[in-house]
């Protein structure tokens, strides 16, 4: 696969925003895996996790920066962390590679872990129609709650959101249940997660099921902590791409 660093003009503020793009150099259009970096990192964060699977399954891979980390040390942190700027950067990057590269626009998949899981859910609440399937692993779903639950990250939440409860709510997936319900989405969360309590995923799922019981929202609570099981997550992605059939069980 060929790697390129691409710069895409933001349709909000016209700034040039970077993404990494790995593409197959064959002529036919390929499915696209969009990988989202975690809370404390940037576009380089998920190369090790996601590139081997893009190579294995023949996907192109897009790794957007979406204004960098959600840390107080990032001078752009108020435009990161689920802001409209960050969401639009991801959308702009997808639009760019669909228009200019060998990308199959009917088969775009989104994947994020931890802070990237938070952002995957924010995108499900922003433009669910862009994605054939979304995987969100150990996601934060309520920033205001998480600020109180994790002292190591509270100052970063405050820096990104300006210590504004309304802003935290705007940047929390729990606020976008009506739109998230339109997505084809699976949430993965470790039952014993010490970083982002499993209650984040449980509460979001509960809200979705009470209001939209027929939606294509799924939840996998696994035996583990704040971790990634790439095989399980990619099985979900591939099953939605290829229509993998499971064995029917009879009584």
Named regions from a protein language model:
Residues 1-27:
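N-terminal cap/lid segment of alpha/beta-hydrolase-fold proteins
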Residues 98-100, 106-149:
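Primarily recognizes the serine-hydrolase "nucleophile elbow" in alpha/beta-hydrolase
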Residues 80-101:
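Alpha/beta-hydrolase active-site loop
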Residues 68-81:
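Glycine-rich "HGGG/HGxG" loop immediately N-terminal to the catalytic nucleophile
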Residues 202-251:
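C-terminal catalytic histidine-bearing segment of alpha/beta-hydrolase fold enzymes
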Residues 29-30, 36-71:
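Short substrate-entry loop that stabilizes the transition state in hydrolases
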């Amino acid at each position: 696969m060929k790697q390129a660093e691409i710069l895409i003009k933001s349709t909000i503020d016209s700034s040039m925003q970077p993404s990494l793009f790995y593409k197959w150099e064959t002529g036919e259009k390929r499915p696209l895996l969009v990988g989202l970096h975690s809370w404390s990192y940037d576009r380089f964060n998920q190369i090790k996790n996601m590139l081997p699977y893009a190579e294995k399954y023949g996907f192109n891979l897009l790794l957007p920066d979406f204004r960098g980390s959600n840390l107080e040390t990032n001078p752009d942190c108020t435009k990161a962390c689920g802001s409209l700027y960050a969401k639009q950067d991801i959308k702009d990057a997808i639009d760019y590679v669909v228009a200019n590269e060998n990308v199959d626009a009917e088969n775009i998949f989104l994947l994020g872990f931890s802070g990237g899981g938070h952002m995957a859910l924010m995108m499900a609440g922003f433009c669910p129609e862009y994605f054939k399937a979304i995987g969100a692993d150990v996601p934060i779903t309520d920033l205001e709650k998480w600020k109180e639950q994790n002292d190591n990250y509270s100052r970063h939440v405050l820096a990104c959101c300006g210590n504004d409860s309304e802003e935290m709510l705007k940047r929390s997936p729990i606020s976008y249940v009506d739109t998230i319900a339109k997505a084809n989405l699976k949430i993965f969360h470790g039952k014993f997660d010490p970083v982002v309590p499993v209650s984040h995923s449980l509460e979001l799922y509960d809200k979705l099921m009470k209001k939209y019981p027929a939606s294509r929202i799924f939840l996998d609570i696994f035996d583990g902590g704040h971790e990634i099981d790439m095989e399980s997550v990619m099985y979900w992605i591939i099953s939605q791409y290829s229509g993998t059939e499971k064995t029917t069980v009879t009584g």
